Amino acid sequence: MQENLLEKQFLNHPLYTKIQELKALNLACNFSLDDSVNLSTNSQAKDEILAITKELKPWRKGPFKIDDLFIDTEWQSFIKFNILKPFMNEISQKCVADIGCNNGYYMFKMLEFNPAKLIGFDPSIKYRLQFELINALAKTPIEYELLGVEDLPRYGLKFDVIFCLGVIYHRSDPIKMLKDLKAGLNKNGVVFLDTMYIEDEREIALVPNKTYSKIPNIYFVPSISALKNWCERAGFKEFEVLATKKTDENEQRKTEWIDSFSLENFLDPKDKNLTIEGYEAPKRVYVRIGI
């Protein structure tokens, strides 16, 4: 019922109509990938495209370049993608899902590794509209569902590889989330997951009081040992740490494409190793988990 309501709201959104009008122009487009997702159209619709992109702020993940328009997103998402790039051979000719896919930046980047099928899940109308704008020009076969991780067990299609990046700390029941991911996998399937974590040898998790790095919906920030235990309790048998990285102001920063604060405002001004609340500053661990 909820997804039907979201889909109806999405289809009735005035920006969806504008994007469909743009799509109907069937603009010739050269689609290429480097750190940015690049779209070259040489079209007369530049003013319309600019207007839609401005209405779709904030742009969190990217960047994107449409002709001479550079969407300098809050996150330089290629940094995260490049951490995972050495493992992308696993998606070749596989059925792949991106859970919490935002505007689809990572999925566009995955295309160069030739997945057989690529589906994004995110229950955000604004992020879906951003995706639809980019894909109206790029014309890729990527699919996008206005669904969340909790919808995976009853989705009807299983996946060989699932990406779930920057989601688990937003969930009040992380083990249930991991079970939902497992339920969405084919036999021998794998999940690539990242989460913020705390430096501690013990099997514990930080439970922030009200906010963590000024973010209100952070429930648990685990140690790596605690994360491993969560995965085992959810039924995963393989757990491999791929990388760790501290989030810095090169990777996440305020730009003209967001109308809010960013990382520099979320850290202790006297000690960048702490959040403004006094917790460890954000850092991420990237893991590969399998059944």
Curated annotation (Swiss-Prot):
It comes from the Bacteria. Carboxy-S-adenosyl-L-methionine binds at residues 61, 75, 80, 100, 122-124, 149-150, 169, 284. Pfam families: Methyltransf_9. GO terms for molecular function: transferase activity, transferring alkyl or aryl (other than methyl) groups. Its EC number is 2.5.1.-. InterPro entries: CmoB, Mo5U34_MeTrfas-like, SAM-dependent_MTases_sf. The keyword Signal does not apply. It is an enzyme of class 2 (transferase). It catalyses: carboxy-S-adenosyl-L-methionine + 5-hydroxyuridine(34) in tRNA = 5-carboxymethoxyuridine(34) in tRNA + S-adenosyl-L-homocysteine + H(+). GO terms for biological process: tRNA wobble uridine modification. Keywords: Transferase, tRNA processing. Catalyzes carboxymethyl transfer from carboxy-S-adenosyl-L-methionine (Cx-SAM) to 5-hydroxyuridine (ho5U) to form 5-carboxymethoxyuridine (cmo5U) at position 34 in tRNAs. Homotetramer. Belongs to the class I-like SAM-binding methyltransferase superfamily. CmoB family. HAMAP family: tRNA_carboxymethyltr_CmoB. PANTHER family: TRANS-ACONITATE 2-METHYLTRANSFERASE-RELATED. This is tRNA U34 carboxymethyltransferase. It comes from Campylobacter jejuni subsp. jejuni serotype O:6 (strain 81116 / NCTC 11828).
